[in-house]
Amino acid sequence: MNRYVMFFLACLMGHVASAQTELRLSLSCPVSYEAAPVVVDLAPYGTVRSALVTVDGRETPCQLDDLDNDGQMDELSFVADMKPGQQRVANVKLMKTATPSEYKAQTYAEIVLRNQNVDKKNKHDIYLSAISIDKQTTNPYNVLHHHGVAFENEMIAMRIYMDKRQTIDLYGKFHKGLELRETQFYTSKEQKAQGYGDDILLVGNSFGLGALRGWNGVEPTMLDDVQHRTQRIVTQGPVRTIVEVEDAGWVIKAGTEPVNMTIRYTLYTGHRDMDVDVRFNRDISNERFSTGVVNVKNSSEINDGKGLRGCWGTDWPAADTANWKLETVGMGVYVPAKYLEHVLPATKENYGMVVKPIGKYIHYSLAYTSDNENFGYHSAKEWEGYMKEWKNRLENPVMVKKLSGGKAATPKQSKSTRSRR
C-alpha cells in the first residue's frame, strides 16, 4: 500500500533564531490510509538535531535524515493512521540541541562485501554504506555479498542486483520482523526451521519487481554501457529506509550523449509498497524507458490499462528444485498517468509498460506479497483487491495543513499541499 505523504513546508519569512521550533499540522484523508507517511522539509528551520512528534497527544516515532551527507538534517518523517474524513493534529518540536530520541528500528539496509575468510553465507561481516564499481569490472554481480544492496521493513525485504539488469529480487517473510541482518538473504536450514523467510522469486533477465530499463522502440534494453555503477544507503531507522542506485555515464543508445541517472527507493514502516523516484542530470523528456513485473509461470495478470499492472503466480525461486519449495507471490507496479506512455502486451518474460520522463524525473510505485505471510494475501482475488485499493490511496493522498499556534520560526501564513507519493 503506497501511503506516502510528502509535505514540504515553505517558509517565506525570515528564520527566527531559537533553540526550539514548534509546528502544528492538520492531517486529513478522503480514504482509509494506514501508516500514512508525513515528511517535513527542514530547510526553513536551520539546524535541527532532535525532534519530538505527537499525534492527537500521543508520542509517535519520528526520524531525522541527512539526505545529501552534508551534516545537516534535511527531512523529518513519521507515519500516522488515517480514517476517511478524519482530521488529526500533529505537534512537531524541532530542537537545535538535545540528544535525538531513540525508537525501535522498523527498517534496515545493508551493503555487504564478500569476506573470503567466512564460510557461512549468512555470516559475512564487511559492511559498507556505499560502493562504486568502474566499467572495467567484468562481473559486478559477484563483487557484493547477496549481489547488491538489500533493504527491508518489518513486512517485506528486497535486494537490487548491481549489474546491467538492476533487478529487484524478493524475500518472503512468514512473520513480521527484521531478518536481513541474521539471514543476509541466504537463510540457513536452522533459520528456516525457526520461521525465517527466504528468497522467493526467480528473476532471470526479467524486470523482477519494477526494475527500470531502457526502451529501443521494440523491447526493453539493459543498462550495458555505464561508466560507474553506485549503490548507497541513504538512511534507515524507525520510520523509513532509503537506498539509491546511480548509473553515471549511461549511454542509453549507441551514438547518444551519456546521462547520469539516480534511482531512489523509499520504504516506510507498515508498508508492503515503496516509492521509486528517478532523476537524471539533464532534461530527457524525449527518451522512453520501460518497467513492469516478471511474468511468473502460470500467473494471473492484473491490468487496468491505466498504469496499474501486476500478477499472482507460483514458481520455483531457483533452478535447484530439490532444496527449494514452490513460492507463490503477488506483485504490482503503479505508474501515474503523466509518466505512462503505454502498456505493453504480456510476454513470456514480463508484464511491461513504457514510461516517459517529465523533464529530469520519473516516479512510480511498487508492491508485493508472499503467500507465506501470516499477515498478507493468499489468492489472486485478494491481491487484485489490494492493488485496486492501493491505487485508490495513491490517487487520493493525505492532505497536510499548517495550523496556527506554533512558536519560533513557524510561519504565520498557512499552506496546504498534496502528498508526493
Segment roles from a protein language model:
Residues 261, 272-305:
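Acidic (Asp/Glu-rich), glycine- and aromatic
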Residues 67-82, 331-421:
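Beta-strand-rich recognition/accessory modules
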Residues 1-23:
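Bacterial Sec-dependent N-terminal signal peptides
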Residues 96-224:
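Solvent-exposed N-terminal domain segments of exported/luminal and surface proteins
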Residues 193-268:
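Extended, loop-rich substrate-binding clefts of extracytoplasmic carbohydrate-active enzymes
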Residues 23-27, 155, 274-282:
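Short, well-ordered beta-strand segments enriched in hydrophobic/aromatic residues
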Residues 52-76, 251-256, 297-316, 335-339:
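Solvent-exposed beta-strand/loop surfaces of large extracellular or lumenal domains
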Residues 20-123, 128-130, 134, 138-139, ...:
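Alpha-mannosidase-like glycoside hydrolase catalytic domains involved in N-glycan trimming
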